[in-house]
Amino acid sequence: MSKPIQMERGVKYRDADKMALIPIKNMPTEQKEVLRKPEWMKIKLPADSQRIQDIKAAMRKNNLHSVCEEASCPNLAECFNHGTATFMILGAICTRRCPFCDVAHGRPNAPEAEEPKKLAQTIHDMKLKYVVITSVDRDDLRDGGAQHFADCNREIRALNPHIKIETLVPDFRGRMEVALEALKDNPPDVFNHNLETAPRLYRKVRPGANYKWSLELLRQFKEQHPHVPTKSGLMMGLGETKEEIVEVLKDLRAHGVTMLTLGQYLAPSRHHLPVERYVPPAEFDELKEVALELGFTHAACGPFVRSSYHADLQAKGLEVK
């Protein structure tokens, strides 16, 4: 029997080390068992442009993180080339250990007090008009990090008065009331919280999360801020059925959510949950039609869609695939 990992504060645990900490064990996928990517999942990545280097340099200068890099997003090159990025606040170490996610797990350091000001200045320097702010889960904080989100919103608007801010928040497990109170005076322009998958798969995909809790977070925020759109996203290809996804869409609408993203799950490594199937583009198109029929005002559905992929276009209701 191997010794349990003794986590040190500020150390990132990834891949096999991270998966070893999950109660539901996921055996590494052998190369011969990995599903071959279909043609529609093969994209030509743009060259490592100067724009990409400039954005990375701006991040490093102010000790900031992008979820694009930390979660190994396949759209990084495209988004960076277009001058957009999703900033990840509260550090790059998550207190959760979801087996689909490539963000490192461990004992995070205390939040950096100057991060909101640094973030606001970086956004100003990059001349962004729409920004997405997300974070790792911070179960070690009394409010789950909600006040830090509010501080970032306030500082960003102070330097960038015409900007639109979308926040992609964690579930604030056990801290919903205090978290929503912290966000009360500085809400975002779009409030995003991902359900990720169907409730049947939560124990495997989102250990530590609760489907009904996440729905309630979306409902309560909308109740307190009726003019702020709420948004959620799901991954496809983890073993869910189309019928289960439709039921989740109905639940989201019943809780006031009007913006939706559906995308293909891609395993970051053989140590993560394997891809059960690659969903054809036509099926994404069908689900988009279902979503619009259910009353979603915006639905971005396609193999490469992610929560923050072209989020500015999503917010305008433009086509994103």
Curated annotation (Swiss-Prot):
Keywords: 4Fe-4S, Cytoplasm, Iron, Iron-sulfur, Metal-binding, S-adenosyl-L-methionine, Transferase. GO terms for cellular component: cytoplasm. CDD domains: Radical_SAM (cd01335). This is Lipoyl synthase. It catalyses: [[Fe-S] cluster scaffold protein carrying a second [4Fe-4S](2+) cluster] + N(6)-octanoyl-L-lysyl-[protein] + 2 oxidized [2Fe-2S]-[ferredoxin] + 2 S-adenosyl-L-methionine + 4 H(+) = [[Fe-S] cluster scaffold protein] + N(6)-[(R)-dihydrolipoyl]-L-lysyl-[protein] + 4 Fe(3+) + 2 hydrogen sulfide + 2 5'-deoxyadenosine + 2 L-methionine + 2 reduced [2Fe-2S]-[ferredoxin]. It comes from Vibrio cholerae serotype O1 (strain ATCC 39315 / El Tor Inaba N16961). [4Fe-4S] cluster 1 binds at residues 68, 73, 79, 308. Pathway: Protein modification; protein lipoylation via endogenous pathway; protein N(6)-(lipoyl)lysine from octanoyl-[acyl-carrier-protein]: step 2/2. It is found in: Cytoplasm. HAMAP family: Lipoyl_synth. One of its GO terms (molecular function) is lipoate synthase activity. Residues 80-297 form the Radical SAM core domain. Signal peptide: none annotated. Its EC number is 2.8.1.8. Its cofactor is [4Fe-4S] cluster. Binds 2 [4Fe-4S] clusters per subunit. One cluster is coordinated with 3 cysteines and an exchangeable S-adenosyl-L-methionine. Belongs to the radical SAM superfamily. Lipoyl synthase family. [4Fe-4S] cluster 2 binds at residues 94, 98, 101.
